[in-house]
Curated annotation (Swiss-Prot):
Membrane topology designation: Multi-pass membrane protein
Xref: Pfam families: Branch_AA_trans
One cellular component (GO) term of this entry: plasma membrane
Protein name per UniProt: Putative branched-chain amino acid carrier protein SERP0977
Lineage: Bacteria, Bacillati, Bacillota, Bacilli, Bacillales
Assigned keywords, A-Z: Amino-acid transport, Cell membrane, Membrane, Transmembrane, Transmembrane helix, Transport
Molecular-function GO terms, alphabetical: L-isoleucine transmembrane transporter activity; L-leucine transmembrane transporter activity; L-valine transmembrane transporter activity
Compartment(s) where it occurs, according to its Swiss-Prot or TrEMBL record: Cell membrane
Organism name: Staphylococcus epidermidis (strain ATCC 35984 / DSM 28319 / BCRC 17069 / CCUG 31568 / BM 3577 / RP62A)
Gene Ontology BP terms: isoleucine transport; L-leucine transport
Taxonomic superkingdom: Bacteria
UniProt similarity note: Belongs to the branched chain amino acid transporter family.
Transmembrane segments: 5-25, 40-60, 74-94, 114-134, 143-163, 193-213, 229-249, 290-310, 317-337, 350-370, 382-402, 417-437
Known function: Component of the transport system for branched-chain amino acids (leucine, isoleucine and valine), which is coupled to a proton motive force.
InterPro entries listed in its UniProt record: Brnchd-chn_aa_trnsp_Livcs
Amino acid sequence: MNKNTWIIGFTLFAMFFGAGNLIFPTQLGLESGHFFWPAILAFALTGIGLPLLGVVVGALDKHGYIGSFNKISPRFSLIFLIIIYLTIGPLFAIPRTASTSFEMTVTPIAHNSGNLALFIFTVIYFLIVLYLCLNPNKMIDRIGSLLTPLLLITIVAMIIKGFVDFGGHSSNYGMTNAYHSNLSGFSQGFTQGYLTMDAIASIAFSMIVVNAIKTTGIQHADKIFKQTIIAGLIAAIALVFIYISLGYIGNHINIPSDTLKELKAKDQNIGTYLLTTMATKGFGTFGKYLLGIIVSLACLTTACGLIVSVSEYFHRIIPKIPYKVFVVFFILVSFILANQGLNSVIKMSVPVLSVIYPVAITVILLILIARFIPTKRIAQQIPLIIVAIESILSLITTQGWIRISLIDSLPLKEYSLEWFPIAVVATLVGYMISYFVKQSNIVYQKE
């Protein structure tokens, strides 16, 4: 393993690692109670395992996911990538960076979480983002290269102090209505992992990793594939350590029920409160300020990277509209949504992610299968169509818009995993039907 592989591995870690990756495992630890381990392991599966798999699978074709998706259907490739870029961009991920920064800085320091304070903060925040994105230079890279090690060192220090301060406490009782068995803990952790959005982000990040490996002089697809796996494992190990550690500490922080009620009444995010509690307990007032500033800078650089990526993609598919117009438009959309507050942004993302994630997981696995088993286009199209339809119908039923009894009776519906057995059966059916269809097998381009 050479130096470049380590650098690429930690670069991938930096791309995946954001404030949301701190909030969700910590809150999961608190809420899971005695069913912490099945919950956190399932969370790691969707929050780390799937993103790792997503990056690796993207290296199977020299054109990345654009090439792989085009082999399924050019129309699917265009529509699904647009949905993914909007999801990890202006609709959810970018607004979340602003609202998270607000809750990690202004709320704990000024004890003010009002709408006016949020509005003023997001105006300043997105003006900085606008300036950096309209004038992209090495400033963002320099901030990122300095910030990531500093953020990692700070979090590790906080984790060590957290184990000292809270590790001896007994596990809290958690949310017994949602976490009442090992299986329910697993299913809750699995779906909570959706909120990191890293699995769908891996589809966008994969090409960045592949190009970075190519710049080191490696050109053969098999060697690129191997280096991608190693780099992905480096990032995954770092994320596993942080997720489990933060979750474990969150599981052993005893928050009075009155405090939880007060947080819910103020619509303040519990995860950010737990992190601030850890920092303050460990390092006093200094820890609260330091964590707030570092997380805000991490969110800022993440927002800039996402705005640039999304704007460049849309400029590529709609070249008549200038890049800067997309930048301004997506920042305005992000600004409006960020002012709904962190909890509102998270709540809005849940229904959308419940549809996107099953499709994303299915397509990643189908591409991986096609790498080893001769596969025709229709064998991938059938399960994707069925999973997409089932996910939409399940969302409609879950939200109570229309009650569909068939959806309620599906296996694993209670655990929000009803799409998985359907995906397995649909894949088997797709491959059987493909034997009777005259199509050439999918071949991923290596050179």
